[in-house]
Amino acid sequence: MAGGHRLLLENARQVVLVCARGERFLTRDALRSLEVLEGASLVVGTDGFIKAIGPADAIQKQFSEETFEERIDCSGKCILPGLVDAHTHPVWAGERVHEFAMKLAGATYMDIHQAGGGINFTVERTRQASEEELYSSFQQRLGCMMRAGTTLVECKSGYGLNLETELKMLRVIERARQELDIGISATYCGAHSVPKGKTASEAADDIIKNHLPRLKELGRNGEIHVDNIDVFCEKDVFDLDSTRRILQSGKDIGLQINFHGDELHPMKAAELGVELGAQAISHLEEVSDEGIAAMASARCSAVLLPTTAYMLRLKQPRARKMLDEGVIVALGSDFNPNAYCFSMPMVMHLACVNMRMSMPEALAAATINAAYALGKSHTQGSLEVGKQGDLIIINSPRWEHLIYQFGGHHELIDYVIAKGKVIYKK
């Protein structure tokens, strides 16, 4: 019996499925060659989920009596899953372009931080900004990410450090989640820095006694939806004990643990994350061998951020060792005032050049594995029947051009589609 569907993508040169057997993540040998169909078509239903993928002639025959709200001829082009950005700080006021000049002159991240710059500078301006001002700039930033192919993005609070401003940021994120087409995973990051006038232990007490109970209440009322809890576990910021207390308290109210660890100093944050059952740990430039082995065994995702290592001139995360040992490696842009990058294609390119990842490894890390880091790989991160119709169409006969063409994604990306709806067309 004939029926209606939302979208038919016809005659693509390549359809990059990434996965084809319902995998929730890819490691080791599964990353050597991703699942790719040649000369294929794809159907998205009116519910926004993929209904069929296969050879173009077979799809044409199967759906010859069906109607579609939209058809797109993909001849000579490639269809890929929408990209997933597993780590961003996109809600803030007060740019820090002046600090870039300081870094170029030799100042370190912690030099700037201890001089009252860095996070502290942004916190002051974010506290002063209205909710509407924050939403306006956030919406523009999400638009830039979406035009670069991102269809699911993790969004952190963390430039408030007091309950009032953290909730203001989370309301901004919730509004975007409700109103915009891009997918959002919301993260409470009230432990991004220790507020002036408090010790790490005092800040942790405030978060545990005041912030988290309020988040639980607002979540129960349906006012704010938060998925993850984050802490900046670092020397002279939050030590292991404070980090453990905050993360465990967040887990106790149902939040996934997804935190900053082992970035500037070896803290044994990876080992702590595994102990607490973390879904993901980000940065990991200074992770220990034991931490890598523990993360691999626990299926705890490593969210690597090549932009940060590049811009701060840090040593690169040991992606190659993590991949070889079976860690679930994901990628994020770390978009923030200190690492101003919207583009996951650029992140993938940097991962390949600076972290020695292959192009299939980088694409998996920016799709299925990034979705896994956010607890979303059952619905997003690959092109499979039953998953959300989140995808991009690039004007190239080979998918690798999305990574190969450094900085050229605006010329490549013809369409960005979320749940079968075209949200960007060049």
From Swiss-Prot:
Residues reported in the UniProt entry to bind Zn(2+): H260, D334
Family, as annotated: Belongs to the metallo-dependent hydrolases superfamily. HutI family.
One Pfam family, short name: Amidohydro_1
Protein's GO biological process: L-histidine catabolic process; L-histidine catabolic process to glutamate and formamide; L-histidine catabolic process to glutamate and formate
Binding of Fe(3+), residues: H260, D334
Record-level Gene Ontology MF annotations: imidazolonepropionase activity; metal ion binding
InterPro entries hit by this protein: Amidohydro-rel, HutI, Metal-dep_hydrolase_composite, Metal_Hydrolase
Cofactor note: Binds 1 zinc or iron ion per subunit.
Pathway listed: Amino-acid degradation; L-histidine degradation into L-glutamate; N-formimidoyl-L-glutamate from L-histidine: step 3/3
Official protein name in the record: Probable imidazolonepropionase
Keywords: Histidine metabolism, Hydrolase, Iron, Metal-binding, Zinc
Catalyzed reaction equations: 4-imidazolone-5-propanoate + H2O = N-formimidoyl-L-glutamate
Organism: Bos taurus
Residues the entry annotates as binding 4-imidazolone-5-propanoate: Y159, H192, E263
GO CC annotation, single: cytoplasm
Cofactor requirement: Zn(2+); Fe(3+)
Residues that, per the record, bind N-formimidoyl-L-glutamate: Y159, N336
EC number: 3.5.2.7
Key word Lipid metabolism present: no
